[in-house]
């Protein structure tokens, strides 16, 4: 099959928005990057908290961490997106729910729902990576810290977590890349990200190959930058002889 490529389509004026088709994709690129960064901040913070809880010698706290992981890992992500956008606002206090649904700009509604959903979903995966990293450390590190008079929180803060951070960099790279790819699902609830803009470009120009090739390259570019940055971080924090070092 012969494909008639026309990359000049991106420089043509879009039907609305006072911009070109390339401007549409650039706008979607910015939304995708913003969503990925904000969702990752949520995922990192929440995931680390619950990951630590899963390793503490307290059955209630560790059970709480397990419940969180099982809840978010075992429900399809697209279902979670629609739950956060359509169901959760109905469960909020009446005034807050009405403000979110009636007064907040729809684009902000889409973004906030997507950010929270993607962040909490990814946090469950981060939680497991943190748990695995802490449990992979030699047991003697924790015992030695406690024997020196440190409390359990101090042992985590000064001994276990600094070493776990170094172990966890490679799997965190994968989770960040997965988050970027999963962000495309946000277009199903109305967020105008790269995937949505590519769909618009296809609808108005009928150039499917060009539009989806362009966003494919954009996703590859974002993840390539993540890989490069995290590779530098991994080399920076690596300690000779430590777990995970070469």
Region annotations inferred by a language model:
Residues 1-246:
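Transmembrane alpha-helices and adjacent helix-loop boundaries
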């Amino acid at each position: 099959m012969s494909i008639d490529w026309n990359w000049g389509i991106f420089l043509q004026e879009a039907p609305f928005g006072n911009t070109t088709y390339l401007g549409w994709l650039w706008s979607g690129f910015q939304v995708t990057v913003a969503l990925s960064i904000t969702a990752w901040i949520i995922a990192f913070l929440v995931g680390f908290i619950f990951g630590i809880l899963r390793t503490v010698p307290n059955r209630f706290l560790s059970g709480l961490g397990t419940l969180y992981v099982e809840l978010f890992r075992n429900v399809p992500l697209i279902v979670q997106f629609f739950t956060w956008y359509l169901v959760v606002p109905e469960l909020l206090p009446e005034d807050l729910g009405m403000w979110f649904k009636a007064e907040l700009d729809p684009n902000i509604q889409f973004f906030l729902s997507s950010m929270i959903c993607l962040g909490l979903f990814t946090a469950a995966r981060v939680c497991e990576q943190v748990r695995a990293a802490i449990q992979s450390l030699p047991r003697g590190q924790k015992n030695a810290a406690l024997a020196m008079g440190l409390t359990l929180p101090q042992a985590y803060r000064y001994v276990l977590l600094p070493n776990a951070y170094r172990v966890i960099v490679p799997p965190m790279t994968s989770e960040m890349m997965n988050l970027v790819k999963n962000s495309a699902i946000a277009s199903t609830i109305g967020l105008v990200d790269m995937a949505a803009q590519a769909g618009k470009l296809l609808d108005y120009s009928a150039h499917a190959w060009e539009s989806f090739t362009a966003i494919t390259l954009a996703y590859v570019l974002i993840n390539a930058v993540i890989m490069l940055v995290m590779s530098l971080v991994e080399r920076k924090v690596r300690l000779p002889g430590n777990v995970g070092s070469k």
